[in-house]
């Protein structure tokens, strides 16, 4: 959600400008989140957390996830919508999908052409679910007003037009890089090893049918 707020208020750009010796308030007029529409693509654990924070900021939330029921989406504050409805009506779009053969370049030229002019785009999920070259084209044309990326098709990115674009906020895959998150991961690993050794249920296995 920090990416969303930074994107809405041009915080990194304004910081760099001030540190560069400028006092240029007029160039960094942002937008408020209240009353804006955010499209949350992927309503798993992280997507639901984003929905709840968006509701707290009085945003209208459209959610897309083919595996979530309308009742479930409504229960945590999202209006379940088709991907077309999300693209056409959202001021902000944030993606929270795994990278699979079905989701690779889930957002590309065709999908971006359906968006509102000036849409703000966020990817803190997985590199590759958004076509970076398509985003650069959309930024250059003004179709996308700004973007925030924490993940990339190539990590670390090399000579990336996306990273170097003036209207892109980017961080080096920091989504889970908090002290608390790292401690929690270690605890979960230890708990799961204990469960396996005591013949209890195996959770989150990627190689069990």
Provide a role label for each language-model segment:
Residues 1-37, 49-52, 201-205:
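Phosphate-binding beta-alpha-beta segment of Rossmann-like dinucleotide-binding domains, i.e.
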Residues 4, 90, 139, 189, ...:
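Hydrophobic "lid"/C-terminal helical patch
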Residues 13, 29, 151-209:
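C-terminal helix-to-coil terminal segments
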Residues 43-44:
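Glycine-rich Rossmann-fold phosphate-binding loop(s) that bind the pyrophosphate
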Residues 51, 55, 139-140:
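Gly/Ala-rich phosphate-binding loop of Rossmann-like dinucleotide-binding domains
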Residues 58:
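Short glycine-rich hinge loops at helix-strand junctions in the catalytic core
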Residues 62, 66-161, 177:
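Rossmann-like adenosine-cofactor binding region
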